[in-house]
Amino acid sequence: PLIFEQLLAVSVGFVDTFMVSIAGEAAVSGVALVDNISNLLIQILSALATGGAVVCSQYLGSRNINMSKKSAGQLIFIMSTLSSLLMVISLIGNHGIINFIFGKIEKDVFESASIYFYITAISYPFLGVYNAGAALFRSIGNSKISMNTSLIMNIINICGNALFIFVFDMGVAGVALATLISRIISAIIIIGLMSVSYTHLTLPT
């Protein structure tokens, strides 16, 4: 499940690149460029979340449920704060970041990349929360929950892409919006599951 989940995590951008091809080469190139940034951020957030979840796992191993709940809440807070900071930096430095990483690129490719980067950057806080929740579930050996949530995220993304591209003809903005919506929903699902009383990861109130 863990390997499959990791594949699903990075497949969102791949699907976006594939489905936006109808909008032209510039759209494909722009989305593909930003997808490189997104994949790097996903790996960083996943690694940080996994490290934080180890603490919660240790408390669970020692049967200290209260501290495990507290550490889970702290991890969610830290990840949401960090990813929100990344969002702000990405929104403010949109053009500068693209220019710095990729150098001089064609105007139409740059515009597509900027649009996709701007909209998907809004999803970073939700991506951070999802990664935190997924890591916490994996830490107690319940990787199926995070895998299934990731699968749902991908299904929503594919359906959203189809709707926004083929029905509303939104191009790059459409695939970015579908990605944003899918990550919001996945974060809501993972937090909801964590809050259910039958898990040991109920968020502290």
Q: Which residues make up each language-model segment?
A:
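N-terminal transmembrane alpha-helices
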Residues: 1-18, 22-23, 39-51, 83-87, ...
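Helix-loop interface residues and adjacent transmembrane-helix termini in multi-pass membrane transporters
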Residues: 11, 22-25, 139-140, 167-169
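Interfacial/gating helices of multi-pass transporter permease domains
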Residues: 19-39, 107-112, 172-173
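Small-residue-rich hydrophobic transmembrane alpha-helices
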Residues: 28-88, 127-146
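Hydrophobic transmembrane alpha-helices of multi-pass small-molecule transporters
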Residues: 40-43, 157-158, 187-191
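Short alpha-helical transmembrane segments in multi-pass integral membrane proteins
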Residues: 56-123, 167-201
